[in-house]
């Protein structure tokens, strides 16, 4: 039989094995302060941990200003050599907006597991295709696997949390060029 290992959070700041910016306790405390916490509270500990880890991976898929504080740190934050609102980023903590982004993205991912990858099988992009008189009918309520290029397309509100830190804003598929 296949045994599934429970997801474990490692939120060590600058940790070489870190997989999350926040602990489950921090996430649960955050959701005690929002108008509707039921969409988080109704998840198991394992579902919450998996969502937090997945959210971290997506947050780390972007390119950010500044530099990682330690070469060996697993995650993109903390960072230094950059300011937000005139305040230098600190190597001792994760910026609050990064944490907020992770909380909200984790909740979104936990409640819509197909949001990024799309659906599969009969629910793909095309519902019908003909060759004679060439006719294509598209599914409008479905998005095929791999059709999302940018998590910001699905969750544009992430820009309000991450935008000040991101190189290139919401379309952060840019490459930093260093001329020397």
What are these regions (language model features)?
Residues 2-180:
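Divalent metal-cofactor coordination and adjacent catalytic microenvironments
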